């Protein structure tokens, strides 16, 4: 069985992330969205909420599960019996970092391959950072995130 691990902070999960998950769900038997705790990034949403939002966005996909983690990615991949890391590349600027990460992961988990997918053109400009900035300034984010995510962002910035 091919099990792909799609790691990220997902703060928040966007339609771009959702697009990659949908496409991966057609390519792999099982897709694991691995939501990283990432405390050094100082996420807007706590891990539990990011996991719940990702579950809401992907609940229509029966072969997708969402799991939070706070360990080394290579170790987590082994725990999950994953044989592929999935990473999205929006632009050439993403490639250098992702290339270094893939090589490091290969050293730490040689049995797990890295696969890069580019997003659909309509999502290639979306990033969680931009979505957070637009939401913080009261802008319309409905084109970029699932309604549940938009609601969570609206509530978060009303405080």
Swiss-Prot record:
List ligand-binding residues for ATP. 9-10, 17, 88-90, 98, 123-129
Q: Which domain of life is it from?
A: Bacteria
What GO molecular function annotation could you give as one example from this UniProt entry? ATP binding
Please tell me where substrate binds in this chain.
Answer: 9, 41, 73, 87
Question: From its record, what is one biological process in GO terms?
Answer: coenzyme A biosynthetic process
Q: Which UniProt keywords apply?
A: ATP-binding, Coenzyme A biosynthesis, Cytoplasm, Magnesium, Nucleotide-binding, Nucleotidyltransferase, Transferase
Location in the cell: Cytoplasm
Site residues, Transition state stabilizer = 17
The main enzyme category here is transferase
Q: How does it assemble?
A: Homohexamer.
Q: What is this protein called?
A: Phosphopantetheine adenylyltransferase
- Which taxonomic lineage is given here? Bacteria, Pseudomonadati, Pseudomonadota, Gammaproteobacteria, Pseudomonadales
